Amino acid sequence: LFQLVTRRSVPIFLASSFAFIAPIIYGVQTWGIPSTMCGLAAAGVFYFLLSILIKLKGPQALNRILPPVVTGPVIMVIGLILASVAVNMAMGKTGDGSTVLVPENTALIIAAISLATTILVSLLGKGMFRLIPILCGIIVGYAISLPLGLVDFSPVGKASWLALPNFVFPEWNFQAILFILPVAIAPAIEHFGDILAIGSITKQNYLESPGVHRTLFGDGLATSMAAFLGGPPNTTYSEVTGAVGLLKVYNPGIMTWAAIFAVLLSFVGKIGALLQTIPVPVMGGIMILLFGAIMVVGVNTMIRAELNLMHPRNMAIAAVIVVCGIGGMSFEAGEFALKGIGLAGILGVLLNLILPQGNHIE
């Protein structure tokens, strides 16, 4: 779909977005999978609206509504709001901490090895290995778990080779929409960076042709379509951009064939069953890094914009977003409820529009 919308001119690959992991976990626990899919489909619609705004007003219009002083703290909240889930899983528990699945000491060792492997590969890896540190961390953690008897292969044996994916269709839930919608801010900002990055590699200006409004529209269309089939949102994959630069292969058609291959793999039942055998501590160790990395992206967003966070206006906006988002503040009126990332994002946008710019204070 993305290649169709962008006229097969951008060699970039769409895959599942890590930015949505935390809100998806919370959404499934709170409202269930169908309602969460509704919120994720709305994220795609948000991309549509942004693409229309960019087409009519230009890319600078987005920065007026969502400047770094808003997007940075919101991205930080996304990474921090479910940090406890990663820690619980690293300790061998379920995400909410209610059930112990693996003895704590054993789980912490496995999580630490998985985390350390991921970090070391990202720092010291060469060539293709540097592009897949998370996969390396999972493989090493999985290998450590095998002799400890923490991997149950019975689901793989029961699964058939050919099987239809478990399609789940969205179910209307306005609260889920309000909670997940602000999360789309981070991938939207990342989208611009990835388009600039792939353009610098191929020496093409994709912001002009086919235009960032087309690339963002294609991203949104793919995200909404994935949600209607029970899948996670998509994002322009930075790892594949790195692979394009490494291999010097700029043909967008290769991305189309890669996408077709990924779709075909979804019909191999044993692959899905094998992924479900990954022990909880392995993913817990990885998620510590993933959620922390999302938070760091938020901090870096403000650093790159050279924001003076001691300026009273900037301090007020950032402080309200982070504390309200992480602290659990909620607003309820009848059946309407707003909390978490959704409330934090809306408060940030409103404060940015309402508070006067004032003078720059060092």
Model regions: which residues?
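Membrane-embedded helical hairpins/re-entrant loop segments and their flanking transmembrane helices
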Residues: 1, 5-6, 182-252
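Helix-loop-helix hairpins and the membrane-proximal interhelical loops
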Residues: 1, 96-100, 130-213, 361
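Membrane-interfacial loop-to-helix junctions in multi-pass transporters
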Residues: 33-34, 68, 105-109, 169-177, ...
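Juxtamembrane helix-loop boundaries in multi-pass membrane proteins
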Residues: 8-18, 64-78, 210-217
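Membrane-interface helix-loop-helix modules in multi-pass membrane proteins
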Residues: 9-42
